[in-house]
Amino acid sequence: GGPKRGGCAVLRVRIAALFLRCAMSVLRHLALAGLVAYILLCLMMFVLQRRLQYFPDPSPMDPAAVGLPQARSETLTTPDGERLVIWWVPPRDASRPVYLYLHGNGANLQARAERFARIVADGAGLYALSWRGYGGSTSTPSEAGLMIDARTAYGELVRRVAADRVLLYGESLGSTVAVMLAAEVPVRAL
């Protein structure tokens, strides 16, 4: 009876060792697969970061079609050659402020038409910028590009009205740019 027990014990040890080697091999392969998946995910996020960060609606826009007939759609060219769409509603008189409107992510100026109608209802002016890549404007959005767009729009607006009449209105994505712009240029309010 003794030799059989020793043989069974050796067999059990060998089976356990084989199982352990197989388990370790599977774990190594899983770890390697996980590492490869993580690296691919990081690479994908790097390559697609603009698409994950910005959600532009590039559709062309007509202010009259969305209930803002007093707005003129204009085009402004940035120093880096991009064309931006601007909706311009002059103020009722020289005493009224003008809102430089920097919109948020995920839509275009058409989606804000009701808000614009409320802004201009009391005679204030509106200079609403459509970021690069949004609503008829060229290129694709980027942090540096948004700042170029805002500086360009501000520069054109202060050729039309005094800086002390400009109110910066930033919505969501545009609020960050508005704060950064207000740190650089004179405005009536933010």
Predicted feature locations:
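Alpha/beta-hydrolase fold nucleophile elbow
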Residues: V161-S172
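Conserved dinucleotide-binding and phosphotransfer motif residues
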Residues: D122, R160, E184
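Extreme N-terminal basic, low-complexity initiation segments
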Residues: G2-L11
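A conserved short beta-strand
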Residues: P186-L190
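Glycine-rich nucleophile elbow surrounding the catalytic serine of serine-hydrolase chemistry
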Residues: G170-M180
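An N-terminal hydrophobic leader/cap segment in hydrolases
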Residues: L30-T77
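N-terminal Sec-pathway targeting helices
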Residues: I15-A37
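Membrane-embedded segments
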Residues: P79, R83-E156
